[in-house]
Design a protein with these regions (language model features):
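Compositionally biased, low-hydrophobicity segments enriched in charged and small polar residues
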Residues: 37, 48-51
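Active-site-proximal cap/lid insertion segments
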Residues: 4-27, 43-47, 54-188
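Ligand-binding/active-site lining segments
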Residues: 30-32
Length: 188
């Protein structure tokens, strides 16, 4: 028996390939994956035989979309910047050319969820922006309502403050840390 997400999967209402058959399951990927594994353990396996169960979660993979029940976790926390946050990578050419920098490479729409309904915020990468907006569109109405209630004020604040330079870099870091830790919280 096998049941896997397509690619890395989607956080909301993901498509699984269940023994070769694709099917979309409504809900949050971590909860669904865990429930499928527990169901197999309890109800579907041959209990007279040994088994190996490999359980791989979508979290903590990009784009770090938290479950709606975890959106407010860590709201009151400001995470300290790592000592090397503003590293210039002097003398380390390969490190200076990587594309995983919060400052340079973290996409405002795709990674940081600033997909506004007015379509005023744009990514530097049109493909990432399109995909970021598609991730939102996978949600059902209840998921969207919870998501919007949380993210819309953040989006409006982002638009109003027009952060640049260090202020923008540090804002990106806080957004990333909050979303990342909320997403992996679901695995605990």
């Amino acid at each position: 028996y096998w049941n896997i997400l397509v690619g890395q999967g989607d956080y909301y209402n993901p498509i699984f390939i269940d023994n070769g058959e694709k099917r979309q399951i409504e809900g949050y990927a971590t909860n669904i994956t865990t429930d499928l594994a527990l169901d197999w353990l309890d109800n579907k396996r041959d209990k007279s035989k040994p088994f190996c169960l490999l359980l791989h979660h979508k979290a903590p993979h990009r784009t770090w979309m938290p479950d709606t029940c975890d959106l407010r976790l860590y709201d009151d926390v400001t995470f300290p910047l790592p000592e090397n946050f503003y590293d210039d990578y002097a003398g380390r050419i390969a490190a200076s050319e990587q594309e995983m920098s919060i400052i340079k490479d973290m996409d405002i729409v795709y990674d940081l969820k600033m997909a506004d309904k007015e379509n005023e915020i744009h990514s530097s990468n049109a493909d990432l922006e399109k995909y970021g907006r598609e991730l939102y569109n996978r949600m059902n109405p209840d998921q969207k309502a919870a998501w919007d209630a949380y993210y819309d004020p953040i989006i409006q604040d982002f638009k109003a403050k027009k952060r640049t330079g260090k202020e923008l870099a540090e804002w990106k870091y806080q957004r990333y840390m909050h979303d990342y830790l909320r997403a992996i919280h679901s695995v605990d």
